[in-house]
């Protein structure tokens, strides 16, 4: 999440379309261990694996990815009834995947989180990250 917010800077002067997502699906093992949702956790659902918590969301995320592969647009062939995945842009919104497939939708970045990420982008070189 942090890297996605910080990496917005290369697109400020480019014409690239930027789209963001947040896979916020906590599986039982990670919840018990305290890991939370790990980086690239959605990959298993995209490629046909995943946990019981992820299975209801798999057709939705697969629809976006296969649509992008087919048409270079995640919305063209997305799963019927799923929300439009909008461009990041000035609204700073991203497609959010919570544990409930009926609540998948666009959400804005929390201003506090953006402030923390901006701070980290300033000190990142100092702390070696």
Regions found by a protein language model. Give the residues of each.
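C-terminal helix-and-tail extensions that cap enzymatic domains
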Residues: 1-129
